[in-house]
Amino acid sequence: MLATESPSPVVEVRDHRGRSYRVGECPEDLIGCSRTWMLAFAWIAMACIGVLQYGFGVALTALHVTGGGNLTGALWVLALWVVFQAGAAAPTAVLSHRFALSPSRAVPAGAALCAAGPLTVALTDDFMLAVLGYSVLSGIGAGVVYATCTATVAKWYPEKRAARVGLVTGAIGCGAVPFIALFATILTPDNRTAVFLAVGVVMLVVVAQAGALLQNPPEGWWPQHIDPRQWAIDKTLNRSLSNNVTPIRQYSPSEAVRTPAFLVMYLIMVVAAAASLLTVVYVPILAIHQGFSLALAAVAVGLLAVVNGTGRSIAGRLSDRLGRRQTLTAALLVQGCAQLGLVYSASGALPVAFAGFAALSGLAGGAFYPLIASLVADYFGEPSAARNFGAVYSAKLFGGLVGIGLPALVVASQHLPLAFLVASAVSVMAAVLTRLLHRPGLPVVGLPR
C-alpha cells in the first residue's frame, strides 16, 4: 500500500521578542497559486489608479494650452483629492482589522469610487460636482485601493516587506505613463468627454477585476522555507538587521501615536509629500510657463513617473543594506537638489536638463513612501504595521494642501519658480529631521552630574 504525502503541520512559533508566527503553510495550499500572483494583482490595481494623481497635471496643462480655462480651481480639485485619498488610508486599515474587510471586497468597491473621478470631469464643468466626484469619491476610492493593496502585499512578503511594498506602490507612477502620453498626444477640449469616459471605464474594469482576485494570508503567516526565529536574529540570513533596528515591543496605533518617533515621521511625511506633489503636478505647468513645449512637459512628467515608480523598489532594497533612516535622508537631500535644478534649468531654457532634474526629483520623491512604511514596521512592530502606517500616511493630506493648493494661488502670477525654491529648502529641512528619529521604548539616559 502506497503512503500518501500529508501536508506539513501548521505550528505557531515565537521569536526572542515574543512575536508569534504561523508557519507550515505554502501559498499554493492557501490560495491555489504562488504569492507572486497576489503581488501581480495588487500591482495591476495600483497601476490603473496612478493616472488620478500623476496624469492630472499633464491633462490640465494640455487642456489649458489648447482651450484656456482657469487653472487655480482645477488645481484645488486635485489638492482636495489628495486630502481624501490620504485620509482614507487609516480608516481602511481599521476596517480591515476590526471587521475583516477582505481585499476582494475592498478593492472592487474602491475601483467604483475611483472611476467616479474621470467620469465626473468627463460629463460636467461644474466645480462643486468635480469636487464631489473627483476629489471626494475618487479620492476615497484611491485611498482604499492604495491601503488595501499595500497591506496585502506586506502580509504575503513579511521577509521582503521593504522591497515588495516599494514595488507595488511604485506601480502608481509606472501605470500613469501610458495615460500621460495619451493626454499629451490627443487630449483637447473637444474630445475631453470621450477620453475621460474611456479612462474611467478602463479603470473600473481592470481595478475591480484585479482586486476581486486578491486574498490575504492567515494572521501571522510566515513562509515555511525560512525559520522566523533565525530571521529575527541572524544577520547573514536577514541582512537588513545590520543597519536597521527591530522594535522593542509591539505598539498598537493608540500607543504609537504618543511616541516622539511618530511625531517626527508625521512631520517628515507632511514636508516630503508637499515637495513631491508640487513636482508631480507643477512640472508641466512650469515647463509651459518657461517656454517649453507640451511634448517636453509630457516627457518630463513621464520620466518623473517611471523613475518615481521604479525608485521605490530600489529604495526598499537599498534600505535593507544601508539602513532605512540613512536612505531616507539621502532621498530627501536628492529631492531638494533636484528641485533646485528644475528652477535653474527652466530659467536657463535647458530642456534636456529640465527633463533630467524632473526624473531625479521623481526618483527621490517616491522613495520616502516605502521607506517610512518600513520604518513604521521597524519601530512599532509588524502586527499593527498597516494601521500605524495608515496613521502616518494621513499626513499626506496636509502635504496636498501645502504642495498643491498653496502654489495654485500664485500660478497665474508666474511665481512658480519661487514655490520650487521653497520646496527645495523644506526638503533639506526634512532630511535634517531624520536625525531626530529614534526607536521608541529605549530608556532615556542622561550624563552623570
Task: Label the predicted regions.
Residues 117, 129-144, 270, 353-367:
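Hydrophobic core of transmembrane alpha-helices in multi-pass small-molecule transporters
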Residues 172-225:
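Helix-loop-helix hairpin linking two adjacent transmembrane segments in secondary transporters
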Residues 290, 296, 302-308, 312-314, ...:
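C-terminal transmembrane helical hairpin of 12-TM major facilitator-type secondary transporters
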Residues 185-201, 409-426:
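A membrane-interface helix-boundary motif in multi-pass transporters
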Residues 56-63, 254-313:
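Extracytoplasmic gate region of multi-pass secondary transporters
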Residues 143-157, 164, 367-380:
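Intracellular juxtamembrane helix-capping segments at the cytosolic ends
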Residues 176, 379-414:
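A late C-terminal transmembrane helix in Major Facilitator Superfamily
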Residues 88-101, 312-323, 411:
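Helix-to-loop junctions at the C-terminal end of transmembrane segments
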